[in-house]
Amino acid sequence: MEDVLDLGEAPSRRSGVKMGRRARASQENQQETADASRNQPGREGPPKPLRQGGWADDSSGPSKSTKRMTEDVEDSRLKQQSLDESDEGEDIPVIPDLEDVQEEDLALQVASPPSVQVNRVLTYKDLDNDLMRHAAFQTLDGDIDLKLLTKVLSPEPEVREENVQWDWDLLFTEVSSELITEWDVGKMEKEDMLKPSPLVS
């Protein structure tokens, strides 16, 4: 339902959206009726001022002149310069053809290993020989005396053990026999301690 307010306007007939010339013509008719209603002497209140401004404002002023100057500067930057001016002082780089470029086979190039001086690591045998023969190794950095250490060092054959495969039964009998002998020795010592010693008077 449409409510029509009595503001001195005739009820308008609503139809579909108007496009083209008809839409412009209806807008002009509405503006003419609005101007005519403003000019009527019997109407109360002051006339409504026409508002202009925004994007479509064509008023001239100081801000408009500065806008034009900035637009001119931007336009000159965006305009393409002529080819004659740009070619005067600059050389155009030439892209070489693929046939002119010699292919380098990177697979055949091997990087050289880094050259770092590495001290040779001595074996135990070398260390033993040097330690026993040279008295210079008996002090370390001139401050630490190694003579006591060299006196108690054992030779390598005495320290090195052979790799022997263990048999469970044999290992069990060896360990059990050693435990029994230790137990027997401990038992005998206790008995000796518990025996009353003859009192000497």
From Swiss-Prot:
Q: Where is composition skewed (Acidic residues) in this entry?
A: 84-100
Q: Is Mitochondrion among this UniProt entry's keywords?
A: no
Q: Where is the composition biased (Basic residues)?
A: 15-24
Here the segments flagged for biased composition (Basic and acidic residues) are 68-78
Pfam families associated with the record: IFT43 (PF15305)
- Keywords on record: Cell projection, Cilium biogenesis/degradation, Cytoplasm, Cytoskeleton
Source taxon at top rank: Eukaryota
Positions of the region Disordered?
1-100
Composition bias of kind Polar residues appears in 26-40
For the biological process aspect of GO, one term held by this record is:
cilium assembly
Keyword Cytoplasm listed? The answer is yes
Task: Provide one Gene Ontology cellular component.
Answer: cytoplasm
State the compartments where it is located: Cytoplasm, Cytoskeleton; Cell projection, Cilium
Under the subunit heading, UniProt states: Component of the IFT complex A (IFT-A) complex.
The free-text function statement in the UniProt record for this protein reads: As a component of IFT complex A (IFT-A), a complex required for retrograde ciliary transport and entry into cilia of G protein-coupled receptors (GPCRs), it is involved in ciliogenesis. Involved in retrograde ciliary transport along microtubules from the ciliary tip to the base.
Q: To which protein family does this belong?
A: Belongs to the IFT43 family.
Q: What is this protein called?
A: Intraflagellar transport protein 43 homolog
| Organism (species) | Xenopus tropicalis
